[in-house]
Amino acid sequence: MRFFTTEGPVRAADNYCLPPLQRWDLDEVLGLIEQKKYFLLHAPRQTGKTSCLLALLEYLNQGERYRAVYANLEVAQAYREQVDKGMGAVVEQIARGARDQLGDAAATGLAREVLQSSTGGTAVGEFLNRWCQGAARPTVPLLDEVDALVGDTLIALLRQLRAGYPQRPTAFPQTVILCGVRDLRDYRIHASSESAVITGGSAFNIKAKSLRLGDFTAPEVTALLTEHTIETGQVFTPEALARVWDLTRGQPWLVNALAYRACFEMPQGRDRTRPITLELIDEAKEYLIINRVTHLDQLADKLREERVRRVIEPMLAGTQLGQVPEDDIHYLIDLGLCRMAPGQGLTIANPIYREVLPRALAFTSQASLPQISPTWLNADGTLNPAQLLDAFLAFWRRHGQPLLGSAPYHEIAPHLVLMAFLHRVIHGGGTLEREYAIGSGRMDLCLCYGAMTLAMELKVWRNGAPDPLAEGLTQLDGYLAGLGLNWGWLIIFDRRTGQPPIAERTATNAQSSPQGRQIAVIRA
């Protein structure tokens, strides 16, 4: 039996998968190898890079033109700035790959000999030089996780490859493929041996090209999910197929995680006589988000980095990016957190990430909340919007000011505290979805609890800006129209200096939107 997997690399005998060599332009790759080019494959984590490298390894070694060897350099990360030990680990990994993949037992002996007589600054180059000289076919090393190396160890590797480059293909590899998360040109290498930051492009200026492994396309998502149908007879409804694409935008790990949860973990999905429905996919999505599975937790952890905050904070606030360094934007795209959307500019990569990021940022505020009685529930357990509004106003007046300090992003602190409160409201019984974008001037929230849907728009009144009430009412009209609702909340956080304390200024009143919808305006 095969299954969807989130622990790569994929094995076609065990896992549903797309043919790895079809995920990139194989003719282009083979052309670069034939031209003796050194190049890079990069993509966000858990997108299939290693699976593609291993498929290429098998493809090349089945032919008679090249001998390819795969080596994962992550083991050298533990040595950080210790060049001798780090480069020794790189040499050993390549030699073991030669032994295990090519049956070249002599490579490990050569590695030991080289390491006894060479320093870390020359060991990799010396080993590759001597190993290639005795080869009947040109050598193609596939070096994975190259960006696990840092500082002096990364510089040492790149410079040795550059130094040996003129000797290819008889006394050095014909082609070297480096694989990692970031494009090498965007590396900013802080080496203890150098007084200035070194860019990857200057340390490895022999690189011919950078290939980026993309996410799945919509047809590829359908093809992958159909593998399960072919094997088991269990179908995905058209709505479920569309929902997987809409939620993930083809991010490979997310596609597999949703499908695995729906088909192999949820009791309804394990019944192969029942189709996988949109509702099952939505339940799987909520499970992944609430449980902060490893992939999502790793992304959320990046929010602590200053260069990530410089981009994500204005996106959440709906303001312009301002003077954000170009490298920060490239970094978030390389991480897979963001993408450039046609006609929209920079945006969060997919709806699941769009949910995870603000939820992660609101976690500390949520943990800081005092005990709150659920006065917003009717006797039958349904949500009462009027009582929820009263509960929020009481909560905000009493706890808003101190809780703002618990939010990690100052510009959106009110948003995060509000979301923390709403997560307490829906705990175990509803969902909270968010919409935000650069320059939109707002964040939209949609709270669903049973049959009740409550939409709200969050705006900030900043120094020097006019009262956002009129703009907010117009914008909220459009949001409510899209949801088919005729009422909602407009929350205006007053962040101007010199305002009365939150406990004194928080108030609400009823307004009509330009299209006649009933709006509760909350000034906080």
How would you name each of these model-derived features?
Residues 424-451:
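Active-site metal-binding core of divalent-cation-utilizing nuclease and nuclease-like domains
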Residues 23, 219-222, 226-335, 341-342, ...:
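Winged-helix-like regulatory helical subdomains adjacent to P-loop NTPase cores
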Residues 9-10, 153-239, 244-247, 265-289:
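The catalytic "switch" region of P-loop NTPases
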Residues 469-473, 477-508:
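Nucleic-acid nuclease catalytic cores
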Residues 1-47, 51-60, 126-131, 386, ...:
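Walker A/P-loop-proximal flanking segment of P-loop NTPase domains
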Residues 6, 68-69, 80-105:
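Conserved NTP-binding/hydrolysis module of P-loop NTPases
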Residues 62-79:
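Conserved catalytic segments around the Walker B and adjacent sensor/switch elements
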Residues 96-156, 162-175:
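Mid-core helix/loop region of P-loop NTP-binding domains shared across ATPases and GTPases
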